[in-house]
């Protein structure tokens, strides 16, 4: 049973070694993995110092500010609310809610509009073209090559990168679950292509025609080449990367409310948030149980943060499985795994180099190898 894989003797609850600016070389050579509580105490001590030192400083989307620290604290307290799969900490959920609300208020940020989301020149690559990002990573032309930038890997439009050939996209089941009234669905190419929607694409009419000929169904166009420069990596590859958008704070708030058994308020936050995504006012969240609410919330969060590195934490925190094997699936045959809870592939195996350099970690205290633990769906 693959579930047993995730709880090997002696490893459950261990995180990583703590390294600070005061850690000596000798100490680093015998530095053990610390338990979850010790690690979170360390994380919180750093964040609480940051909260104190940076108080009142607005920063920008590309440098730390008070709202960013509040956002990190909101993330941290949300995780701490889950003591185990069956034990929860309401005080931690309340703190997560409070810090999420602070981040929203201090940042002055607002959810992306449809025009900003679908912008063929600046979509998800520019910290300055919208008012959503609380924190992002700037990218400059000196640090990119045709294959050495995030855009090179993720952009299906950029002719100079891997994304042009890989065409990363949504699973069919996710795509089908997103409402046709939700403009986030336009992040992925429908099987009917331009007959379904007049996608906002970069390039000339000839380039757009060529794009439609080669693009696969469900491929993403969420992440754009900078300035729409699909043929020039020097310019098109210089895309900032979003690390924290204000939208995430609304999701943290609603999850924290639901876990405090305030479903009415949680439904209200989700309904209000979705008015920014299904703008005709037709969406209403009316989940009657926490389980039903969290299921709906996670669906909307998947549509919101696809490709941004946010969702793996939700899946692990909420003990969600993956479903890639099903009738009509568009996943490659070698990737059709189904799990009923956390997937073993999300555990990171520690490499041999760490054992050789750090005697505090031995192979016996490694995370287990997930290779071939889950059978392929057929």
What is the role of each PLM region?
Residues 1-151, 162, 175-378:
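Acidic/polar-rich alpha-helix caps and helix-coil junctions
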Residues 156-172:
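Short, cationic low-complexity segments
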